[in-house]
């Protein structure tokens, strides 16, 4: 965070205005999902007068003041937030409790944040204003900030906590607000069944900016039905830390409270999330070697699990069953020959999964005598990069046991072990330094089959805190590194402040519904997204999920139906779902060999190129992706479903009928694209792929090639086992951001 500090002394009355120069050119890249109303936030300001500080913009005014050595929150009328003397609370393990008002207020300063056009985080591409306060109590020191960037419809506060001596903590409450519900008439409630779920009302959203937060209104579930009868509703965020803050170490935590545009809770939160996530949404199509080179071949005994202290790199034993550098190079060479040289495209990264390492060391086994040197060079020739799988707590199966065995007597392969933590960060950072890594797949931070939070032990809590800390530490090396944090994550939207992608839950592969095994696989994958995100955590974005994308392999327990058309449907769903990360678990020989309806081979490479074109072409609208239709499989019936995105200018729509019989869906384009109620417009759609049949024998009832009023009822008919993809334009030429011009 680049900033300039100005200490306030005596009587100062001034307006500090953020500069508009450069905002609009940046905004196209920094903010692809915009607060969905006509009036926008505009430039952030800071007004200071004597002991008063007012952060504001076109949408909100947030006031603070200093009285008798206490920094006081004076409220925010637009968000119905009441004044309070308490900015945060802390509790130590010995049951000592104190708040900001109990600490010594050392200083209050104003801050100006400059825009960084190259920042990975969208919000940092905008200028802003802030207030910084320093509090002390004994050996403890807290730096607290209130931050308002240009274009923000929300306020963030940040805490950095340090201590001169070790102090054992219990919890911290960085968010302590009270809502005047007499005025708001809409009480914030927890939306979602996970740790790190959002507090949401018709007017505001709030929460700690960590998936480990417990956000609450302190109302028992039995009383939720009558919550709006209460005059005042608390909003608190609790950060549980049953561990020791070591002397000289710093803990950081933050929170947000923001406005909800009328009838637009999802997009209002998403507009905030896209600005504040660790790295802005961007296409990340990757090849992953798991099925082609690794599955069932990654468990070589590695010295039979016995470790010789003289064998510091754990190279003894037979790793010949694991994948080799030669195999990896062969894969990359074939992608260059069949894909890059023909279509001018490549995955953003070639990712090499479990099996490359000498167990426990996160260095290379003898099958990689030069590490990833050659595959990195080959990938760079296509403008691509590489990445790899690492299991922070060891991984799975026998290889996982061997890795954990290596750390026996060394403090354990736990992220709470300082020696192992530092070693893991170093190994990850070395991969960036040596091989220009673009991607890490951090897998298995817990063993839960379907997670809604961390393992509920102190060790489980701290393992999750540690992976968050690791990702923040390694990102210092490369701001745009892409993290796919897999098993052990859950559907909290605040994971995206750390990780770029999270896991959809349950098995890598499975079957649900009807149709052949490939159709059932697609249904299984998408049903879990509907269950765990759309249904149970509806505010959590679905625009960067690990779903297992496209699986086309001879190896492992996966679909063995090799129908060309079915594979194309799987590809179009994998891209049409709008996830920035599309995983290609594809054997190149199958991409070569599978024949189309005319008996020709090689067509799947072309279909993949078309899909990547579609993603790139629609990258400006896909961050808005959201669910359309029903549950892919509700236990009894397969239902039409899909994904849509809209940004006021463009739109995309992907629909799938997973049933073995034709089906219909009756809707409006307003509902499909989640268009705000005050906007009156029409949308013109076109088919995204030339082979899609529109009309008889294909999809019907969805007008294509002509303007359709968004409030007109339409009944869409789809043939069995079908996928159709569309893109189009909004004929109203409306821009949410035009108020910022």
Predicted regions and their residues:
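Aromatic- and carboxylate-enriched substrate-binding clefts and catalytic-loop regions
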Residues: 347-552
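N-terminal secretory signal peptides that target proteins for export/translocation
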Residues: 1-9
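Acidic-aromatic substrate-binding/catalytic surfaces of carbohydrate-active enzymes
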Residues: 32, 50-134
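Boundary at the C-terminal end of the N-terminal hydrophobic targeting segment
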Residues: 28-30
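Non-catalytic C-terminal accessory domains or segments of carbohydrate-active enzymes
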Residues: 32-41, 87, 105, 627-631, ...
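Active-site-proximal substrate-binding groove within the catalytic cores of carbohydrate-active enzymes
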Residues: 57-58, 93, 248-249, 467-696, ...
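Bacterial N-terminal signal peptides
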Residues: 14-24
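Conserved structural scaffold segments of CAZyme catalytic domains across common CAZy folds
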Residues: 113, 118-142, 146-157, 161-397, ...
């Amino acid at each position: 965070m680049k900033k300039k500090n100005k200490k306030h002394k005596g009587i100062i009355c001034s307006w500090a205005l953020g500069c508009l120069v450069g905002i609009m050119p940046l905004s196209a890249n920094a903010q692809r999902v915009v607060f969905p109303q006509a009036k926008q936030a505009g430039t952030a300001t800071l007004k200071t007068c004597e002991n008063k500080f007012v952060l504001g913009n076109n949408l909100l005014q947030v006031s603070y003041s200093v009285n008798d050595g206490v920094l006081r929150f004076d409220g925010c009328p637009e968000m119905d937030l009441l004044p309070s003397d308490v900015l945060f609370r802390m509790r130590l393990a010995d049951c000592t409790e104190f708040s900001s008002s109990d600490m010594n207020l050392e200083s209050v300063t104003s801050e100006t944040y400059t825009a960084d056009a190259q920042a990975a985080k969208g919000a940092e591409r905008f200028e802003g204003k802030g207030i910084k306060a320093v509090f002390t109590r004994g050996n403890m020191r807290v730096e607290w900030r209130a931050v308002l960037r240009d274009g923000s419809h929300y306020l963030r506060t940040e805490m950095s906590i340090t201590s001169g001596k070790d102090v054992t903590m219990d919890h911290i409450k960085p968010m302590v607000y009270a809502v005047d519900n007499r005025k708001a008439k809409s009480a914030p409630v927890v939306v979602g069944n996970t740790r790190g779920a959002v507090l949401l009302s018709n007017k505001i959203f709030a929460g700690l900016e960590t998936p480990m937060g417990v956000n609450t209104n302190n109302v028992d579930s039995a009383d939720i039905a009558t919550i709006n009868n209460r005059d005042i509703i608390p909003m608190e965020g609790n950060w549980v830390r049953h561990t020791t803050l070591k002397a000289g170490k710093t803990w950081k935590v933050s929170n947000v409270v923001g406005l909800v545009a009328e009838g637009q809770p999802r997009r209002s939160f998403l507009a905030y999330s896209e600005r504040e996530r660790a790295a802005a949404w961007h296409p990340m199509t990757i090849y992953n070697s798991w099925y082609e080179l690794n599955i069932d071949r990654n468990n070589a005994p590695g010295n039979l699990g016995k470790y010789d202290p003289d064998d510091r790199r754990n190279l003894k034993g037979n790793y010949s069953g694991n994948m080799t550098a030669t195999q990896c190079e062969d894969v990359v060479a074939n992608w260059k020959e069949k894909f890059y040289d023909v279509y001018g495209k490549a995955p953003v990264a070639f990712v090499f999964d479990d099996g490359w390492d000498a167990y426990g060391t996160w260095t290379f086994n003898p099958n990689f005598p030069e590490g990833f040197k050659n595959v990195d060079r080959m990938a760079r020739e296509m403008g691509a990069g590489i990445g790899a799988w690492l299991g922070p707590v060891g991984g799975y199966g026998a290889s996982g046991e061997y890795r954990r065995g290596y750390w026996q007597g060394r403090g354990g392969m736990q992220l709470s072990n300082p020696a192992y933590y530092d070693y893991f960060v170093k190994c990850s950072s070395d991969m960036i330094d040596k091989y220009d890594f673009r991607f890490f797949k951090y897998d298995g931070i817990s063993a839960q089959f379907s997670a809604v939070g961390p393992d509920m032990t102190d060790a489980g809590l701290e393992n999750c805190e540690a992976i968050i800390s690791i990702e923040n530490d390694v990102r210092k090396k490369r701001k745009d590194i892409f993290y796919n944090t897999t098993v052990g994550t859950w559907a909290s939207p605040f994971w995206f402040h750390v990780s770029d992608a999270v896991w959809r839950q349950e098995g890598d592969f499975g079957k649900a519904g009807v149709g052949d095994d490939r159709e059932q696989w697609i249904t299984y994958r998408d049903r879990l997204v509907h269950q765990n995100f759309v249904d149970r955590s509806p505010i959590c974005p679905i625009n960067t999920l690990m779903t297992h994308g496209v699986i086309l392999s001879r190896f492992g327990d996966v679909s063995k139906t090799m129908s060309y058309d079915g594979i194309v449907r799987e590809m179009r769903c994998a891209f049409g779902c709008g996830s920035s990360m599309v995983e290609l678990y594809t054997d190149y020989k199958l991409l070569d060999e599978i024949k189309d309806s005319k008996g020709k081979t090689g067509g799947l490479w072309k279909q993949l190129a078309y899909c990547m074109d579609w993603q790139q072409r629609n990258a400006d609208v896909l961050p808005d992706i959201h669910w359309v239709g029903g549950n892919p499989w509700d236990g009894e019936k397969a239902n039409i479903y899909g994904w849509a995105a809209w940004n006021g200018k463009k739109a995309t729509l992907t629909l799938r009928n997973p049933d073995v019989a034709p089906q219909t869906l009756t809707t409006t384009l307003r509902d499909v694209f989640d268009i705000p109620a005050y906007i009156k417009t029409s949308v013109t759609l076109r088919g995204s792929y030339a082979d899609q049949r529109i009309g008889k024998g294909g999809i019907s009832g969805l007008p294509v090639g002509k303007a359709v009023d968004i409030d007109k009822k339409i009944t869409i008919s789809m043939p069995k086992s079908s996928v159709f993809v569309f893109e189009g334009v909004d004929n109203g030429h409306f821009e949410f951001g035009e108020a910022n011009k």
